[in-house]
């Protein structure tokens, strides 16, 4: 399995049977400078969304139309995407597990919000925010936390799914900050590797992963992969 951070909370996950984009906010993403759009979206089969904010839905509609990718999202967000012309949708909700070729995806809790600004500037609620747990046939289990704060039921997520790789928001202000994110990883999970995200993009959130790296320093069993956007990481089952 290969995982590429595309800036902010966007990731490309490649396995033998699927190419999954998570929260594909590319155009207009300050953290995606230097990311080639065509290469980032090449061969995409699925798009998975954690919630309905514009910096996570991003280019979903355009990518889904161009590539015929299946979009996996909370039911309310999926309905809205259908109204925007997305044809291949697989809706779910918190606690639900959806099966696709080579992997399953489970919607778990996240502490955040989920809405999209309408043309008249009013926020339209788009269901609950989620974290996403991916179980693969031939690759380590992956947990993208979405946008969230720490919460004690992360312990249940670990008990039920035992994720080996974590994608963790660390930028503060709209999510937990680096120190709290490090606490979440250490207290509730046994990750082999973690990829921090939701930083180094907009100026009002943290510009570096320094606080997270410092918080993880006394937990050497977990490898922190805080590399520049565009870096490809490979993982074996």
Curated annotation (Swiss-Prot):
Disulfide-linked positions: none
GO molecular function, one term: hydrolase activity
Keyword terms, alphabetized: Hydrolase
Recorded family membership: Belongs to the UPF0173 family.
Protein name as annotated: UPF0173 metal-dependent hydrolase BAB2_0644
Origin species: Brucella abortus (strain 2308)
Biological classification of the source: Bacteria, Pseudomonadati, Pseudomonadota, Alphaproteobacteria, Hyphomicrobiales
């Amino acid at each position: 399995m290969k995982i590429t951070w595309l800036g902010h909370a966007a990731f490309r996950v490649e396995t033998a049977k699927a190419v999954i984009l998570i929260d594909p906010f590319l155009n207009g993403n300050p953290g995606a400078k230097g990311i080639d759009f065509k290469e980032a979206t090449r061969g995409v089969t699925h798009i998975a969304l954690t919630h309905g904010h514009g910096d996570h839905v991003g280019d979903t509609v355009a990518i889904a139309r161009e590539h015929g990718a299946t979009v996996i999202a909370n039911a309310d967000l999926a309905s809205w995407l259908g109204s925007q012309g997305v044809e291949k949708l697989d809706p779910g909700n918190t606690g639900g597990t959806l099966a696709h070729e080579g992997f399953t995806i489970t919607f778990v809790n996240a502490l955040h919000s989920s809405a999209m600004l309408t043309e008249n500037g009013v926020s339209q609620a788009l269901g609950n925010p989620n974290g996403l747990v991916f179980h693969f046939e031939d690759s380590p289990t992956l947990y993208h936390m979405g946008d969230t704060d720490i919460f004690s039921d992360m312990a249940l997520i670990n008990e039920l799914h035992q994720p080996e790789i974590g994608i963790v928001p660390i930028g503060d202000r709209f999510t937990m900050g680096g120190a709290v994110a490090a606490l979440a990883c250490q207290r509730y999970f046994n990750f082999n590797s973690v990829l921090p995200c939701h930083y180094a993009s907009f100026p009002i959130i943290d510009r570096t992963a320094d606080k997270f790296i410092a918080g993880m320093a006394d937990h050497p069993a977990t490898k922190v992969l805080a590399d520049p956007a565009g870096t490809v990481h490979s993982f074996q089952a």
